[in-house]
């Protein structure tokens, strides 16, 4: 016991080491730092962001906007034409008339807010809203007349009801404990349907309940009842201890498969025939040992489509299950080396039974059309280095497919654009050609949408976009750049560099100090996240993303560049670059990017820092130890430092072989200043990864700082976390004065 106490005291002493800074005068303009933060700028941006309230099934929507004085104005927009009109041409007249009619004085012209705004019958002439005392009123925009009404059946403040499960006219299914029971309303008989249920494989959604009210999982297909359930039997446990639980610390244990464990979670399908009383697992669903299954149940078709994926994700099959017989048929098999695209892979079904299937067989993702039996008919989408992404809309009557895509051979390949192509594979065209990122929100009709166009250096522009015809986008509103700049916003620099191979272009964002002294050279901090499932480089407009602009205004440059292997949107080879080198693949690219930036900006290459969260924390530690003479200060948060004890599919797919290299092995090579921080209740990346790294550093005699958020989970984002990061870099990399360090807030 004494040895463990010694280790704990040693780690605590490291975290409480007194600050050693030169007594200099304050050198940071903290007002500039404050004015560049998201919390300062968000109240200026948010009121100008349209939230479309679509009117029925029409192509018209309503939204409101606030000016700098907080005055709210309501508009109606015809998305087919882009034409915008005022909902209330004279708000003052509207308010006076309403007060006269209702006696309700709570409605104010200066801060006009129409609660529960609702347009009746999908028309714009009449709308209803809620006044004081939960009273509702209807207003006729044509006559200017008010009427008192009951609460409208629907409003914009209410969500659509969830789909209810199909009921059987004769049989009712109940759950008790982990199993299911069937009651025959004709005979009154109650019989047990399943017997295999247990805590790790429950047929009900309330596994701990022991009453008949427990909710069953399945649905009826005629007289056949199908149940999809998770089988976690044999899967190993992960335990966390919450030290803040009262009156005693409490252990939280959950099942968590690790890479190359024998037992993995399995999706199973149970089939029960009420006519015969026979039931059992449909074993054909689980063809791949340790793989995964995704079911798409289609009660209207009397069949079940499902995909099953091999454990290493190098094979994906689309299958059809005949519900009546329980037999399955393989329709499409996709075999990709080293693994499929886990983000974009998918399919859609047409009403005639044809299948739209996504494939990366050419190296770049595209959609293909198959008949209902799995015969390929044609490739639908195409383009040089174009990666087709999610499907936005399928108009089977018009024979068109609208989809998002990335790349295409020109410009920044990370910008999302929208395309349309015929289901005959012809006539593909780009609907949003601007060199910017786009986000499209479709109307319920699927014929028009609200389009947001932006970049990190371009505040949002709002347009309407019609999916039919060639009218293009119609601008109806935007965020004035001058308004944001006056409030303290600074446009970052969009950068393009080459990877360590000297050929592959990499893209990112460079945040600069508000004031640059031409006689000085500045430290640079690299904000990293390696992927592979995504990178965290912002493409659309964001305010002080990750706090990087306000950090830069403390007196440094901050760089965020996506390395090879960091994104599923640039083709198979780029995406799969991590395989076999999960620890090391992004390191050389990040170092090379910094060196290139230093050739065109006043960067002090002797003062390079690095930080990241999750995979970024993992990369931070690996970079600090791989290039110890280059990265001098690192801040690693919630890092998956040992991927051998992380979630199973991460290491199996993205690395591909057992014994995944860890940052723990690199601990003896640490020379710079390092902060490790983690949440004690992290149920995503087990904190054991960080604890094991800390122990390795202690054994290697390496000084470091360690901070534990006792009850935090994976996301550590908080004012205290931000203050901790700023203090660490301010002290060790920027060498700020004691007075400056005292300005850093932790709340």
Question: Where would I find each of the regions flagged by the language model?
Answer:
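Serine-hydrolase catalytic core recognition
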Residues: 52, 307, 437-747
């Amino acid at each position: 016991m004494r040895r463990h106490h010694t280790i704990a005291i040693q780690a605590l002493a490291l975290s409480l080491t007194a600050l050693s800074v030169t007594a200099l005068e304050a050198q940071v303009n903290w007002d500039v730092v404050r004015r560049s933060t998201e919390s300062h700028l968000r109240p200026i941006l948010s009121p100008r962001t349209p939230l479309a309230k679509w009117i029925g099934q029409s192509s018209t929507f309503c939204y409101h906007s606030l000016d700098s004085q907080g005055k709210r104005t309501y508009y109606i927009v015809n998305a087919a034409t882009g034409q915008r009109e005022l909902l209330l041409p004279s708000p003052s007249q509207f308010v006076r008339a309403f007060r006269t009619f209702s006696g309700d004085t709570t409605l104010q012209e200066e801060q006009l807010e129409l609660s529960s705004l609702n347009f009746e019958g999908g028309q714009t002439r009449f709308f209803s809203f809620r006044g004081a005392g939960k009273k509702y009123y209807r207003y006729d925009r044509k006559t200017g007349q008010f009427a008192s009404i009951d609460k409208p059946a629907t409003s914009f403040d209410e969500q659509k009801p969830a789909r209810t499960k199909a009921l059987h006219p004769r049989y009712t299914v109940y759950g008790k404990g982990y199993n299911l029971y069937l009651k025959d309303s004709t005979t009154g008989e109650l019989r047990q349907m399943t017997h295999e249920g247990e805590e790790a494989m429950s047929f009900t959604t309330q596994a701990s309940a022991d009453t008949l009210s427990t909710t069953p999982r399945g649905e009826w297909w005629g007289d056949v009842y199908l149940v999809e359930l998770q089988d976690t039997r044999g899967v190993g446990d992960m335990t966390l201890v919450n030290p803040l639980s009262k009156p005693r610390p409490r252990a939280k244990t959950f099942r968590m498969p690790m890479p190359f464990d024998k037992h993995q979670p399995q999706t199973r399908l149970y089939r029960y025939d009420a006519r015969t009383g026979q039931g059992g697992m449909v074993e054909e669903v689980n063809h791949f040992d340790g793989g995964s299954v995704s079911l798409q149940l289609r009660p209207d078709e009397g069949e079940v489509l499902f995909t099953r994926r091999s454990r290493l994700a190098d094979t994906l099959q689309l299958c059809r299950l005949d519900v009546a017989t329980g037999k399955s048929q393989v329709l499409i098999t996709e075999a990709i080396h080293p693994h499929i695209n886990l983000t974009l892979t998918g399919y859609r079904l047409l009403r005639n039974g044809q299948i739209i299937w996504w494939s990366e067989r050419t190296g770049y993702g595209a959609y293909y059309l198959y008949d209902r039996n799995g015969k390929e008919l044609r490739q639908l989408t195409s383009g040089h280095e174009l990666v087709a992404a999610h499907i936005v809309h399928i108009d089977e009557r018009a024979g068109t497919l609208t989809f998002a895509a990335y790349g295409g051979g020109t410009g920044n390949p990370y910008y999302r654009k929208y395309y349309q192509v015929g289901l005959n594979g012809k006539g593909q065209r780009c609907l949003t050609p601007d060199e910017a990122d786009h986000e499209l929100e479709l109307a319920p009709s699927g014929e028009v949408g609200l389009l947001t166009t932006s970049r990190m250096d371009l505040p949002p522009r709002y347009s309407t976009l019609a999916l039919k015809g060639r009218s293009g986008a119609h601008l109806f509103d935007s965020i004035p750049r001058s308004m944001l700049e006056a409030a303290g916003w600074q446009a970052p620099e969009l950068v393009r560099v080459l990877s360590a191979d000297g050929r592959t272009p990499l893209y990112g964002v460079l945040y600069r100090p508000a004031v640059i002294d031409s006689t000085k050279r500045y430290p640079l901090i690299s904000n990293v996240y390696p992927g592979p499932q995504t990178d965290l480089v912002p493409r659309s407009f964001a305010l002080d993303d990750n706090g990087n602009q306000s950090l830069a205004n403390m007196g440094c440059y901050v760089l965020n560049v996506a390395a090879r292997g960091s994104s599923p949107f640039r083709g198979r080879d780029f995406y799969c670059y991590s395989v076999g080198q999960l620890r090391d693949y992004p390191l050389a690219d990040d170092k090379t990017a910094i060196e290139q930036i230093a050739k065109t900006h006043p960067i002090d290459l002797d003062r390079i820092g690095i930080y990241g969260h999750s995979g970024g924390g993992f990369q931070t530690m690996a970079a600090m130890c791989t290039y110890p003479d280059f990265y001098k200060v690192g801040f690693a948060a919630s890092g998956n430092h040992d991927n051998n004890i992380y979630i199973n599919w991460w290491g199996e797919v993205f690395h591909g072989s057992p014994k995944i290299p860890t940052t723990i092995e690199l601990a003896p090579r640490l020379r710079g200043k390092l902060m490790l921080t983690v949440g004690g209740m992290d149920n995503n990346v087990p904190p054991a990864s960080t604890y094991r790294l800390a122990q390795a550093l202690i054994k290697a005699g390496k000084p470091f700082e360690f901070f534990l958020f006792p009850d935090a989970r994976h996301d550590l984002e908080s004012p205290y976390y931000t203050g901790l990061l700023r203090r660490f870099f301010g002290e060790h990399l920027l060498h700020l004065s004691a007075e400056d360090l005292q300005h850093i807030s932790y709340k």
